[in-house]
């Protein structure tokens, strides 16, 4: 049985899939050369630093992590064989049967290699992957990873940490699928790019709702390798997506080219929903879903697991955690400093959990005394600190190559995740970590995706752009004032309590510590009902409490790190969320005086 054996890419599915997760050979060496001897077994897709890998070793900058296994191609004849990696942190080279198949840089994004011409006819093929990861010694995106964990920064992880899989496809297969729903027009536009030149692509698409075909059409011929078709959704089958009704349409897409029919077929899904920022009935700017004001009420989600670090123990564990978040009355998760496997977003799409997605932070080593400690203490004075050329060294972005790399990372993130209806907002920068030219980052995001909101600079170093006036507040009295952008409290709370039986083995970290469950519950209720709730009438429209779970030393989660228990009283949390929703409905009601 493979770990994480579910189909890894729900938004672009084919029938052919061979999962390569499981035991591989590994070695950690000082060179890129093929290892003289293998040092043991590693359970892919868990990083060697993760207990679940069976290795429990930390890859150091300058070292090489080598993987090896034998494999057979997927069943079938002809076509092409693709090798997919969900994510490898950070830089890797891949060889098949002793020949270079390709490589990749970037620890959070999927990549695909066509290995057809490197396969032998015996059914026993050799796969070797060599990885390096500089962690904090480079400028690449790394999130909360550090080689010296503690407090708000967590253990580094490296190598293969998402599913590896094979797929047999036709010669001229669909390389990319872009699905763009239009809520106002009640349409969905499907665009494909195919692998092989040689004539215009004929594209066919079919939409089903509840098992019934509701739209089907052929697209007009497009330029070489491209095809596009727009389908109209009948009014009687118009089912808007929301947290209460997360309806997903099934989509099937097929292509042919010239006289050849049925070259490739993929299955996907989409939702009809619309995000905007607009005044409510009283002229106060609000986040709107499907043209109606909505209170975004959620949790900061770091995406760490005790046994797998970045990698969850199972797909069922992910689904269970997200379902429990909804059961507590939350409708939002801010995915913080990490990108998840595609199935995480699929479950959010299906369950109706809204996501604010961070662009993973990078840059050279941070001046934490400035961007975190001093700024937190003097936030009102430093909130509008500039992020232009003169300040790049202070904000860890002095290196041109690092800034160029960030531009690619931003584009890769939006392109990889834009298919997921759950995502409502992109967050290019958090608390000044590697921040630079935030206004240009907003422009770059809008060019790639103009259907979602942008929180230009979460916390501080606000340059006045994007859609969100974004506040982090752990220490100051909360006073919301009218703004020209919609107001979000994008981090707050963080009340710590190391729950007996679940506490970390080392020191604990948080923002004020409760002595027991009763005190934690009382402090949580007081913060939400006495401090936060009155600010809804003044324009507060989104809440992100810190945080979903305990993480390593940081014990300020609503859930324990192992997800075994809710730390405050669960009924009290549900009651608080119901009160917040009721107050938001009251203050946005046109009949309110």
Where are these regions (language model features)?
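Accessory carbohydrate-binding/adhesion or oligomerization-edge regions at the termini
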Residues: 1-53, 130, 134-139, 160, ...
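Accessory beta-strand-rich segments of carbohydrate-active enzymes
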Residues: 6, 10-11, 25-30, 57-174, ...
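Beta-strand-rich binding/interaction modules
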Residues: 94-96, 186-221, 229
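Signal that preferentially marks extracellular ectodomain short beta-strand elements
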Residues: 113-118, 230-246, 529
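Short, aromatic- and glycine-rich surface loops/edge beta-strands on solvent-exposed regions
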Residues: 126-129, 245-256
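Surface beta-strand/loop "capping" patches
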Residues: 168-198, 281-286, 579-592
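N-terminal carbohydrate-binding accessory modules
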Residues: 177-178, 252-325, 579, 583-586
